[in-house]
Amino acid sequence: MLTGGCVVSVPNLSFDADKLWEEVERSKISSIVIVGDAFAKPMLESLNKAKEAGKPYDISSVMLIISSGVMWSSEVKKALLEHHDMMLMDTMGSTEGGMGASITSRAMPTETAKFRLNPGTVIVSDDGEEVEPGSGVMGKIGTSGLVPEGYYKDPVKSAETFKEFNGVRYSFPGDYATINEDGTINLLGRGSNCINTAGEKVYPEEVEEAIKLSESVYDCLVVGLDDEKFGQRVVAVVSLNKNSDISEQDLTDFTKTKISGYKAPKNILFVDEVKRAPNGKANYKWAKAEAIDKLS
C-alpha cells in the first residue's frame, strides 16, 4: 500500500496454499507476506505437487516474499527458489521496533536465523556490556530510534524493556542473539521462552530448527518441563511428514549431530499435527499442555 500497490487477500479463514498460488496466477501478484515455515512449507508442498502433476503454477510475477514472526529455514528457502528466482526477505523485529533482515536469492544464499542488523541496533550482554563480534557471547537485541515511552499502565514491563545504554534510549523486547565477526547475527530466541536445564540456557527455536533438519519432520515445538534433577528438561512435540517413520531415539541421535547434546530433547512426543496460532506463530501453551498430558 505504501508503494501504491493493490492488496489482494485469499477468502479462506485457514491458510490454503493452493488457493494462494491460484490467486498469484490470476492477479499476477508481485509480493507475498507470510509467517515463516508455517506458511512456506505448505506453499512449497503445493508447488511440488502441481509440478509433479504436470500443471505447475505460473508464479513468474512474484518478485518478493517477505516473512517475519516465525523461523524460515534455509532449506525451505532454497527449495522455493528452485521453482522461481525471486527475493526472499526474512525480517526480524517486534511490535517495539525492527531489528534486522536477511535477503536470499539464487545468487545470495543465507543461513537459517542469520540476519544483518539495522543501523542503531545493539546486542548487550546480561552483564550490561556490548557484545563483541565473534566473541560467542549471548546478548539481548536493542533497537534505538523511534522508541516508545512505555507500555500503557505497565511501569514494570516498561522499565524492563525500555532502557538507556551509552546515553541512547533503546527498546529491548527480550530477543537473544550472538554476533559474528562479519557483523551478522544468529538469532537464538525470546528470553521468556528460554529453558534452563542443568545450569545451561536452551532456546526452543534453536532446537526446533535442528529437529526440522530431519527429512522425516514436518513441524515441531520445543518446551521446558519441570524436572527434579535438571530444574527443567527439554521436550519436543513433533509431527512427521506423510509416509515418514522415525523413532524417538533415532531423531534424538540426529538432533545431537546438529546441536550440543545438552540442548537435545530428553523426550520427543509425536503428534498428528503441531498446533499453531492462525497467523502461524508458535503455540507454546498448547505444546506444553500436550507434553504434560502425554508424559503424565
Language model: regions and residue ranges:
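Conserved beta-loop-beta connector loops within the AMP-binding
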Residues: H83, V122-T143, I179-D182, S244-E248, ...
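Glycine-centered tight turns that cap/initiate beta-strands
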Residues: S61, D85, S216-D219, G261, ...
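Gly/Ser/Thr-rich phosphate-binding loop
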Residues: L2-G5, E22, I29-I34, L44-T110, ...
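Short Gly/Pro-enriched turn/cap motifs at secondary-structure boundaries
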Residues: T110-R116, T161, G167-V168
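Acidic/polar alpha-helix N-cap and adjacent early helical turns
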Residues: A289-S296
